[in-house]
Amino acid sequence: MDQLQIRGGRALSGDVPISGAKNAALPELCAALLTAEPVTLLNVPRLQDVATMLQLIRNMGVAAEHSQGDDRASSGTVRIDAGALSTPEAPYELVKTMRASVLALGPLLARFGEATVSLPGGCAIGSRPVDQHIKGLSAMGAEIVVEHGYMIARLPEGRSRLQGARITTDMVTVTGTENLLMAATLADGETVLENAAQEPEVVDLAEMLIAMGAQIEGHGTSRIRVQGVERLHGCTHRVVADRIEAGTFLCAVAATGGEALLRHGRADHLDAVIDKLRDAGVTVEAVDGGIRVRSPGAGQLQAQSFRTTEYPGFPTDMQAQFMALNVVAQGTSRVTETIFENRFMHVDELLRLGARIQADGKVAVIEGLGDTGALLSGATVMATDLRASASLVIAGLVATGQTTVDRIYHLDRGYDCMEGKLRALGADIERVKA
């Protein structure tokens, strides 16, 4: 099993490319199942979750290949041909490691009238039920049962298409919105999704579907209208830049007292995070071709309290990374997690490095080290989920001595060559076998 060894104390400096967004690429790979024509996706990151999704759709009889970019730090191109798809089923063996595999349910059901998808796995950061997916597809006329760990969906006897419907989810759900959006493109009539997720990745998926011939309005708002069509065609689509990877590098550069250009980063997708960074004393600018960030120095940062909410609020996927920054800043901050339960598992590991954090339920209070003269000290820590692992890397970049991060397979699920990109910015970091 691989681990990362980090010798901290170096300010990150230079420029680094931001890869395509995992959370856009995964639903877009599933969207390719909606058509029998070839689909080409550009700027697809090389991640374990992407590899798992490709394996999943190949298992159905889909032809899919992922060619690499020109260098280790560039994303690649995926070509998919689902014309010969023969098995509309996603088995447990592949689904268990990745929650996003549930996104195959809507496209398979819409195109073939049936689908069998295992209940999903992924990071252990809460239950995150799929009941909203089932509720929405049922409103569109699907008959769905859950048995033996599988969701088994089919159209009623005599029906060849899902039916348009007005669907209001009980909560804002990104994957739920995406699943219902994809299913609605081939439904008979108009579907209205109320309380829809507004994330940039949802917007990017909608733009891909429109390029395939879908009729969609309102994406990026809480109400999306979809007029179903009888068939979709192939397309070429570029995956939007990963705002969470960009936010992670913003925090890493800020925490280490550095300066960098994040090529391809989209500042307009990170307003809530950038506002907090600026309040902390960090200079962040949207420039031609990316985002420029300059830190006043780790000891000069001002700790910031925040509360995670749905987009366009502060993203839960940036909570752990910003907490690592607060650890080395001046002052006391309060972090409230409202999206997922059990998402403070990184706190115990940060404590091993010398952080001062008290967590109780959904709230963590951080006493910054910036005005105490104390420093984080390297230690061996264990990644517990994807974003928690990123927070430990950031802390390790600041700590004195060597920090070893175990179980980095979590990191590989969501970051494309993170250690290589950090080395390009001057970090002393290497991947080794445990």
From Swiss-Prot:
Pathway: Cell wall biogenesis; peptidoglycan biosynthesis
Pfam family, one: EPSP_synthase
Residue list for modification 2-(S-cysteinyl)pyruvic acid O-phosphothioketal: 123
GO biological process: cell division; cell wall organization; peptidoglycan biosynthetic process; regulation of cell shape; UDP-N-acetylgalactosamine biosynthetic process
Reaction(s) catalysed (UniProt annotation): phosphoenolpyruvate + UDP-N-acetyl-alpha-D-glucosamine = UDP-N-acetyl-3-O-(1-carboxyvinyl)-alpha-D-glucosamine + phosphate
Disulphide bridges, residue numbers: none
GO cellular component terms attached to this protein's record: cytoplasm
Residues holding UDP-N-acetyl-alpha-D-glucosamine: 99, 128-132, 317, 339
Residues reported in the UniProt entry to bind phosphoenolpyruvate: 22-23
Main localisation: cytoplasm
Functional description taken from the UniProt entry: Cell wall formation. Adds enolpyruvyl to UDP-N-acetylglucosamine.
Family, per entry: Belongs to the EPSP synthase family. MurA subfamily.
Active-site residue numbers: 123
Record SUPFAM superfamilies: EPT/RTPC-like
Keywords: Cell cycle, Cell division, Cell shape, Cell wall biogenesis/degradation, Cytoplasm, Peptidoglycan synthesis, Pyruvate, Transferase
Entry's localization field: Cytoplasm
UniProt xrefs under PANTHER family: UDP-N-ACETYLGLUCOSAMINE 1-CARBOXYVINYLTRANSFERASE
Single annotated GO MF: UDP-N-acetylglucosamine 1-carboxyvinyltransferase activity
Designated name of the protein: UDP-N-acetylglucosamine 1-carboxyvinyltransferase
Enzyme Commission (EC) number: 2.5.1.7
